[in-house]
UniProtKB/Swiss-Prot annotation:
Protein family membership: Belongs to the DoxX family.
Subcellular location(s) per record: Membrane
Source taxonomy: Eukaryota, Metazoa, Chordata, Craniata, Vertebrata
Residues of the signal peptide: 1-21
Transmembrane segments: 62-82, 84-104, 111-131
Signal listed as a keyword: yes
Gene Ontology CC terms: membrane
Organism annotation: Mus musculus
Major localization listed first in the record, in broad terms: membrane
Designated name of the protein: Transmembrane protein 35B
Amino acid sequence: MSFRVGVLRVLLGVFFALTGAAKLFQVSAPVSQQMRALFEQFAEVFPLKVFGYQPDPISYQTAVGWLELLAGLLLVVGPPVLQEISNVLLILLMMGAVFTLVVLKEPLSTYVPAAVCLGLLLLLDSCHFLARTKGAVRCPSKKIPPAHGN
């Protein structure tokens, strides 16, 4: 199972590194303009807006791009602790993405990719959690005698 978990981790890491790079570096003019327009919408419904903070759309896009790029790279080549931290950060990011798309009342087909990524990241996190706790929970070596009734 650890091989499959490793493959999932690498695939997710490469995916997020590429999507982060696409947000940071101008791929093509139409794609960059479309992404800028999307982040203008995303900034309008930013979850912290209720507390008076609304990010600049370009800064928002840049921050998300760097987070995806760095967390994706750390998922692939980072030490285990940084892989787990990166996974948690990406889970939070994908939760925010799903929230944003739901608030914008986008069609289901728009937020399915973010929901699938969120599910895969949660699966990866669960596998890491189970691997950590597997050694911590051990069966007792002595048999426990059955309780006798009074």
